Amino acid sequence: MLLAMEGKLFLCQYLIWVMLLLGQLHGCTSCIEKEREALLELKKYLMSRSRESGLDYVLPTWTNDTKSDCCQWDGIKCNRTSGRVIELSVGDMYFKESSPLNLSLLHPFEEVRSLNLSTEGYNEFNGFFDDVEGYRSLSGLRNLKIMDLSTNYFNYSTFPFLNAATSLTTLILTYNEMDGPFPIKGLKDLTNLELLDLRANKLNGSMQELIHLKKLKALDLSSNKFSSSMELQELQNLINLEVLGLAQNHVDGPIPIEVFCKLKNLRDLDLKGNHFVGQIPLCLGSLKKLRVLDLSSNQLSGDLPSSFSSLESLEYLSLSDNNFDGSFSLNPLTNLTNLKLFKLSSRSHTIQVKMESTWQPNFQLSVVVLRFCSLEKIPSFLLYQKKLRLVDLSSNNLSGNIPTWLLTNNPELEVLQLQNNSFTIFPIPTMVHNLQIFDFSANNIGKFPDKMDHALPNLVRLNGSNNGFQGYFPTSIGEMKNISFLDLSYNNFSGKLPRSFVTGCVSIMFLKLSHNKFSGRFLPRETNFPSLDVLRMDNNLFTGNIGGGLSNSTMLRILDMSNNGLSGAIPRWLFEFPYLDYVLISNNFLEGTIPPSLLGMPFLSFLDLSGNQFSGALPSHVDSELGIYMFLHNNNFTGPIPDTLLKSVQILDLRNNKLSGSIPQFDDTQSINILLLKGNNLTGSIPRELCDLSNVRLLDLSDNKLNGVIPSCLSNLSFGRLQEDAMALNIPPSFLQTSLEMELYKSTFLVDKIEVDRSTYQETEIKFAAKQRYDSYSGRSEFSEGILRLMYGMDLSNNELSGVIPTELGDLLKLRTLNLSHNSLLGSIPSSFSKLIDVESLDLSHNMLQGSIPQLLSSLTSLAVFDVSSNNLSGIIPQGRQFNTFEEESYLGNPLLCGPPTSRSCETNKSPEEADNGQEEEDDKAAIDMMVFYFSTASIYVTALIGVLVLMCFDCPWRRAWLRIVDAFIASAKHVLP
C-alpha cells in the first residue's frame, strides 16, 4: 500500500514537472506587468502624435485588457522563461508631423535585444530625446544587439544617442536624412558593431573614423553621394570586412585595387551603378572567398581577367550594362563549379562573346543573361545546363527556330526572354512544361503556334507583340486559365475575338491587343474578365456601341479604346468602376454630352475624348483628387468655358471646338501645366488672371478672335524658369510601373529579382505649332522622360491683338517657340528677345511692326525658324550665326529691308552703326533745308508788303490807278449788300 502511495506521489510530481516544462516550451509565461504598462505608455505617446487617434488604428492589439498577454501583441516577442520583452517593433506610423521619440519610454525593457523603429508611414521619427539621462539614455539597454531605424527622418543629431548603445552588433539606418560628410566619428564607441547599413542617404567624404569599428563585417553604403576613389581609401583597413555594398554612388575612375584587393575576407562586393572605367582589375581574382561580385552598370571595358578562374567560391557574377567591346572570352569561368548566376551585356552593342564550340563548363547555372552580345547562334554551353530558372538572350542576332530544347533540358525553367531577335519559326514543345514567363516579342515568326495551351498550360505572362502574326486570334489562348498578362499588339490579327478567349481567361489582368485589325463589336456581353486591371484595344476596327462586356471588370484602372469605329454614347456602367484613372476613347464616332458623373470619379487622372462628335456645354468642374489630364479637342462643344474648370486640371486641351465667350478668369491656375484653346470663337482681351499660370509649359490661344493688347504680365509665366523639382506633378497611381517580381538570388544586402515591367504608364502626345508646322511632342505624363519634358511654348497667332509687343516677354528665358503672327501688332521688335537663348522658332509675321531688326538677335544660337514677313520693317538684316541660314521668304513684304538674303543692297562699307549715323546726318541736313525754305518765303512776303506801302506814300500814276480800283470795288459792294 505504501509503495502504491509513493508511486502515485512520484507520478503526480512527474506530471507537474512535465506540465511546467511544456508550459515553458509553449510560451505560456505571460509578460510582466511592468513591461505591459510600459508598452501601453509607449502606445499612448505614439497615439498623441498620430493622425489616427482611434485605438483600432494605432497598434490595435496593444489593449488595456488585463486578460490580454502582451507577449502575443503584434510586434512583441518575449523570452519564454522570464516573460521579458526581447523584441519590440512599433510598425508603420502615420504621424501628424515628423516627431522625436522619447527614449525614456524604452527604459523598462531591460532585456530587449532587438528594437525595430522602421516604418513605411508618413512623417516618421526624426530624432530622439530624453530629458533626464540625455545622450546616455540607451546605455541602460545592455542586451540591445539589433536596432533598425530605417525609413525615417533621422539625421546626425541621432548619433550621440546611438553611440551610448555600446552592446549593438547591428545598426540599420537606411532611407533617412543623413546628409553631408561621413559621420562615423559619432559612432566610434560602438566597437561591437558587426553590421552597419547606411544605404539610401546622402553621405560623402572620407571614411577615416571607420578604423574604430574593428569588428565590422558588413557595411552597406549604397545609394549615397560618394564620388571619388579617394573617399574609399580607408576601407582597406577593415580587414575583417566580409560584405561591402557601394552600389548606386557616383564613384568614377578605375576600380581602386589598393582598396578592394586588400580585403581578403570579402564574400560579397557590390559596385554596380557607379562610373568606374577601364578594365576589370586582375587582382580581384585573388579574393578566394568571394561569392558575390556585381560590377554592372558601370563603364568598364576590356576582357574578363584570366585570374577569375581562381574564384572557386563565386556564385554570382554580374557584368551587365558596361562598355565592353570586341572579343570577350568566357573561358576563365570554366572551373567555377559554384557559379549560379551570370549576367553580361554591353552598351556598345559590339561585344563578341567568344567560347569554343566544345566548351563545357563545370557549373550549373540557374540564371544566365546574355543581352546585346551580338550572338548569332545559341551558345553551345547552354546544351549542358540542366537547372536553369531564367534565360535571357534578348537583343541579339539570333535566327531560325526558337530553342524549345531549353525547356526540355531544364524542367525548372520559369522565365524565357528571347525578344528583339530574328527568330522565324516557333516549334511547339512536345512535352508539358511549367514555364511561367515567355517573351518572344519583336521577332519575325509570322504564324502563332497551335496548341500552346497544351505545352505551356501554366503561363502567367505571354508577350508575342510585333511579330507579324496574321489570321484569327488563336483560340488556344482561351484555355490558359492562369495567364494574367497577354500582349499581342502590333500584329496583323483580324476578325472577331473568340468566345473561348473572352470567357475563358478569367485570370487576365493586363490585356494589350492594340494595333491589329480586330473587328466586330467591342467585347461581347458574355466577356468575363473579373480581375482586369489594364485593357488596351486601341487602333483596331471595332464598331458599334460600347457594350456591357466590361461591366463586371470593376477592378479596371486603364481603358484604351482609341482609334476604332465606335459609336453611340459613353455607357453609364463605366462610372461605377471605383479605381478607374485612365480613359482613352479618342478618334471614334462617339456623340452626346460628357456625363458629369464621369468627371466625378475620384481617381480619374487621364481622360482623352478627342476626335469624336461630342457636343453641348463643357462640364463645370472636375472632382479628381490627383490632377487630371483632359483632352477634349476636335469635338463640337459649344458655349463658354466655365471659370471653375481649371481646378485640379494639369493638362486642358480644348482646341478646335465651337466654344465662345471670353477666356474666363479661372478660379485656380496653380495646377495647370498645359492650356490649349486654339481654334475656337473666343473673344475679348487676354485676362490678366492668365498671368497667374505659375507652372505653365505650353499656352496656345491661336485662331480665335481675341483683341486688345498683349498683357506685359505674361512674363510672370514660368515656362521652365522654376527648378525641375518645383515643377513636379502629382503622379497618379497608374504612372507607377507595376511589375511581376521573382527572386533570383539573395545575399546579405543584395537581392536580385526579375522585375517584368507591365508598362502601365501613359505616353502623352501634344501637338504644338513650332517651326511653322505642327509637331508632336511626346513623353511620360509626369514629364519625367521624353521631349515633352523640354518643351515650352506660347502661341497667340491669328487673333486681333494690337498694341506693341511687351519687352517683358524677353524674360521668358526657357521659351522654345513664340508665335505672335497674323495680328495687328505695332511698334518695333523688342531687343529683349535676345535673352530668349533657347528659342528655336520665332514668328512675328503679318503684323504692322516698324523699325529695324535688332542686331542682338544674331546671338540666338538655337534659332531655327525666324519669320518677320509682311510687316513694315526697315534697315539692314542682321548677319552671322543662325541668320545666315534663313531664306528670303522670312523677310518678304518689308520693302525697306536690305541686305542678304534679299536682293536689295545697302550702302557698302558701313557697319550698322555707321548706317545709323549716316541716317542721323541726313535727317539733320533735311531739317536745315526746311529752315532755309521757310526763312526765304517769309522774306519775300515781307519785302513785297514793304514795297506796296512805299508806293502808297507818293503821288504817281500807279497810286491813282490803285485807288480808283479800290473805290470801284467799294461802290459795287454797296449795291450787293442790303
From Swiss-Prot:
First and last residues of every LRR repeat: 141-167, 169-189, 190-213, 214-237, 238-262, 264-287, 288-310, 312-335, 337-361, 362-385, 386-409, 410-432, 433-455, 457-480, 481-504, 506-529, 530-553, 554-577, 579-601, 602-625, 627-646, 647-671, 673-693, 694-716, 788-811, 812-835, 837-859, 860-885
Record's keyword annotation contains Transmembrane helix: yes
Superkingdom classification of source: Eukaryota
Natural source organism: Arabidopsis thaliana (Mouse-ear cress)
Localization (cell): Cell membrane
Main subcellular localisation: membrane
Residue ranges that the UniProt entry lists as topological domain Cytoplasmic: 952-978
SUPFAM superfamilies listed in its UniProt record: L domain-like, RNI-like
Family in the record: Belongs to the RLP family.
Region of interest (Disordered), ranges: 902-922
Keywords of this entry: Cell membrane, Glycoprotein, Leucine-rich repeat, Membrane, Receptor, Repeat, Signal, Transmembrane, Transmembrane helix
Signal peptide (from-to): 1-27
PANTHER family tied to this protein: RECEPTOR-LIKE PROTEIN 14, RECEPTOR-LIKE PROTEIN 8-RELATED
Residues that span the membrane, as ranges: 931-951
Membrane topology field: Single-pass type I membrane protein
Ranges in the topological domain labelled Extracellular: 28-930
Residues carrying a glycan: 64, 79, 102, 116, 155, 204, 335, 397, 420, 463, 482, 492, 552, 636, 681, 716, 819, 872
Protein name: Receptor like protein 21
Pfam families the record matches: LRR_1 (PF00560), LRR_14 (PF23598), LRR_8 (PF13855), LRRNT_2 (PF08263)
Cellular component terms (Gene Ontology): plasma membrane
